């Protein structure tokens, strides 16, 4: 009987971390092909065709391209970036002084997953690197966990001075500006 209880106790101890991990990453976008820990191999391609115009201030573009997808720019698990289609001339992402705080050199893409360590959309950080979310994208990161979500940084091929921060749990991304380190 004692052996059976010991085995049961050990089984519970071994399964607890797996259950906690499942809970941490299981709160994604609610659809199996967005988020859930997926990390795209690369960022979005540059817009090559006639770009979609930036939405008018009163307009709200639709991003949930499938049932259950987030109403925010996101990436499918097949690598398709949804919502990055306005091109270089999108005035919402024009910076008077691109790279004002330098270039981010911490690493990009799949091999560089960063855990958010604190802050909010106006100033957040990880590993001594500081960032802020672009004003037009503030509504797209309201459900990010600023002290625990994993993100991946990609270079933005269309908007000079901006990067894209991709949230692996939710599968959503935002334009972010690098504010420097230290």
What do the PLM-derived regions correspond to, one by one?
Residues 1-93:
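Extracytoplasmic low-complexity, disordered linker/stalk tracts in cell-surface/secreted proteins
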Residues 60-182:
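Low-complexity segments
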């Amino acid at each position: 009987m004692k052996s059976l209880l010991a085995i049961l106790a050990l089984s519970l101890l071994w399964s607890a971390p797996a259950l906690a991990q499942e809970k941490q990453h299981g709160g994604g976008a609610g659809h199996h092909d967005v988020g859930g820990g997926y990390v795209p191999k690369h960022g979005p391609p540059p817009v090559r065709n006639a770009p979609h115009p930036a939405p008018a201030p009163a307009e709200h573009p639709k991003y949930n391209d499938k049932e259950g997808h987030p109403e925010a720019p996101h990436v499918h698990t097949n690598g398709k970036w949804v919502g990055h289609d306005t091109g270089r001339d999108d005035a919402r992402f024009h910076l008077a002084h691109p790279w004002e705080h330098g270039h981010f050199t911490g690493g990009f893409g799949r091999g560089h997953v960063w855990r958010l360590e604190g802050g909010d959309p106006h100033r957040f950080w990880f590993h001594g690197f500081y960032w802020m979310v672009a004003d037009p994208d503030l509504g797209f990161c309201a459900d990010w966990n600023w002290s625990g979500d994993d993100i991946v940084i990609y270079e933005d091929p269309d908007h000079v001075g901006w990067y894209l921060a991709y949230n692996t749990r939710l599968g959503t991304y935002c334009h972010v500006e690098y504010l420097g380190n230290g």
